Amino acid sequence: MAKTQFDEVSWSQTSTAKLLRSAQFVTSAANPKGYPEDKGIEVGFVGRSNVGKSTCLNALTQQRRLAHASKTPGRTQLINFFQLNEHVKLVDLPGYGYAKVPIAIKEQWAKNIEAYLAKRDALRGIVWLVDARRELVGEDLLLLEWLVSQNIETRLLLSKTDKLSRNQAQQALHRLNKQLELLNVPTKLVSTQVYSSVSKEGIEVLTQRLALWFSVPTELEDDLSNKVTQSPTEIENDEVL
């Protein structure tokens, strides 16, 4: 994975939270021809259909309708780009794993996701949502193997932990970490945490991770910080999709 052309300057958690609130939709693309220019910093969001990617993006940015969650799993086939400022974007990749989607469409999705992950120089890291009630299987394991082989930093979020007790959520996190250990996955490359869009558990921890991935030229840091404004929109307890 090629490095961004920018010198690295860490954002504080507070600055990152403000930056996230400035998110705006840029474009949707079905293939690389429709992507924005490959520059700056991008963080991609992946996960199975109906795991809650859109809800996670909305919670992070404190915008209830920034990312639209489809009521029909497997409906979203496009890659969606959201601009935080002129240098930083969030990227919502199509959900995978929905059984009722035709094989031809599944294969096309896989090609589109792989094309983005393999060839996007701006990609700094991946936020991967997995259901806390499920183990990594099938397509999950294929994606994991591929991310590791491409040396892509990944934060695995155990989502929907609001459906579990605190003890059950911690047990699920332990099982996931044990599974990754047995698969010899480097902990410096793939890290894990619990997350809930309902209780907001894990939002601050995830924001800290994003702060490490969001870096800008030193000479632009103060200017960009001044341009970031707080959105008045507040997140409500939306249904976890």
Language model features: what each stretch is:
Residues 30, 75, 88, 95-97, ...:
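Conserved nucleotide-binding/hydrolysis micro-motifs of P-loop NTPases
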Residues 2-100, 216, 220-222, 226-241:
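Conserved G1/Walker A P-loop phosphate-binding module
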